[in-house]
A protein has these predicted regions:
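Short, small-residue-biased leader/transition segments that mark boundaries at the very start
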Residues: 1-6
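Secretory-pathway/luminal and periplasmic proteins that interact with or process carbohydrate-rich
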Residues: 7, 71-72, 89-92
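Short acidic alpha-helical/loop segments enriched in Asp/Glu that coordinate divalent cations
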Residues: 10-18, 60, 74-83, 93-95
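Active-site-adjacent "gating/activation" loops or surface patches in catalytic cores
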Residues: 11-50, 54
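C-terminal, helix-dominated tail/subdomain
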Residues: 21, 26, 82-171
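C-terminal substrate/ligand-recognition segments
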Residues: 55, 68-69
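Alpha-helical support elements that line or immediately flank enzyme active sites
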Residues: 63-67
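Beta-rich accessory regions
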Residues: 163-189
Length: 189
């Protein structure tokens, strides 16, 4: 009863302070007006601005995914969602942002971060391949590479390290460059 409620509230308080990955970047203005140049992300942001709402999948697999892969400090991700969504409330946003979406709590709620490349977005939407794919792929594979020991030791993610190791050096150079350019333009250190 009340003991469980208090324990869960304390867990939420701790979860809100978590930053498993140690991310420190901040969002630039483009994350508020939908001018990042990544079509799926910009559409999701503009929808949030217009409606104050979006389905769970765009929230999780587009917006949070990209914020996490851009190394945005989770407290700024949480702040963004609290500002942008009409249904924003701690009981929703703390577990969604710090737990499920970013894995900032280190696995209190989930066994892995929800990260994906452009392939998932293409499969789950009507978007066509474009320049945005290389940027998202660069952010994704950069995240995997930076966290290679975590990915290697997680049974649900270890196959990604093998995919990365087989990727051509030319492809890596191209997409990592696109990722770094995006980070430089659309995040603040």
């Amino acid at each position: 009863g009340s003991e469980m409620c208090i324990r869960d509230r304390l867990r939420g308080t701790e979860q809100k302070k978590s930053n498993f990955w140690g991310h420190q970047r901040k969002l630039s203005k483009s994350w508020y007006d939908g001018s990042t140049g990544l079509l799926p992300l910009d559409d999701c942001i503009k929808s949030a601005v217009k409606d104050g709402y979006s389905h769970h999948i765009p929230r999780l697999m587009v917006i949070c995914n990209l914020m996490n892969m851009c190394e945005i400090d989770p407290k700024f991700i949480y702040k963004w969602f609290m500002e942008m969504y009409i249904d924003a409330s701690d009981w929703v946003m703390i577990p969604n942002v710090f737990g499920m979406a970013t894995y900032s709590d280190g696995g209190l709620m989930s066994t892995k971060p929800y990260t994906c490349s452009s392939n998932y977005i293409l499969k789950m939407s009507n978007y066509e391949k474009g320049a945005w794919c290389d940027v998202i792929d660069g952010l994704y594979w950069r995240f995997v590479q930076k966290n290679i020991s975590f990915y290697s030791s997680n049974p649900r993610l270890s196959f990604q390290t093998r995919v990365l190791s087989r990727m051509s050096e030319d492809r890596k150079v191209l997409i990592f460059k696109k990722a770094e350019e995006f980070l430089e333009t659309h995040t603040q250190s």
